[in-house]
Amino acid sequence: MNVKHVLFILTNTPQIGPNQRPTGYFFSEVAHPYEVFDHAGIAIEYASPLGGTPPEDGYDEADGVQLAFRHSKAIRRMARSRKLSEVDVLDYDAVFFPGGLGPMMDIAIDPEVKRVVARAWDAGKIVAAVCHGPAAFLGVTLADGTPLIRGRQLTSFSNEEEAGYAQADVPFLLEDALRTEGADYAATSVWQSKVVIDGRLFTGQNPASAGPLAQAIVAALQGEPA
């Protein structure tokens, strides 16, 4: 059996904004994709720019999927995430960036993140992100000199969603930044699920999109039509 491998790349940022709002990765955007991938028999590994334990945000114990992940061996592995510069992205079939506000601070600007995303794309891998995770794609230039997202269809946490959530905390509006780099951006109603697939670029709009995004990635890895 050919086991597929997905690399989760998480933030190391625990605070954001002028009031030092606690943040990190958004818990459901790891827990729900993990459940989908694990059920499909896909192997998951974890990395972050600095390595170690990624800070978390938004845990909801009333969500059974999150509760199960909280008490899983997987979260203990994630607490020992590998330093991204020590990971060979070519060992994986897909890379996935969960959201949370943290990625707006480190994932959005980290040079190693940009190198890994470009290398994964140029090697034919699936590149995926949800919510604020597409900040990873900003500034990524491919081997042929073109920006990764120019002319590509994608989604992310929308300006409308940010206005009611963290506009005072984030250093920029992600939707605006993606559009500025030439992305063909689309979003649905606030907090509703939306997944956009453009070739090997897979994106989800918000927390509600995390599970469906993972399902789309599984289908692609297993050779099913989109």
Task: Locate the predicted segments by residue.
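Extended, subdomain-level signal for the structured scaffold at the beginning of enzyme domains
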Residues: 1-123, 127, 135-226
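Alpha-helical segment proximal to the catalytic Tyr-Lys
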Residues: 131
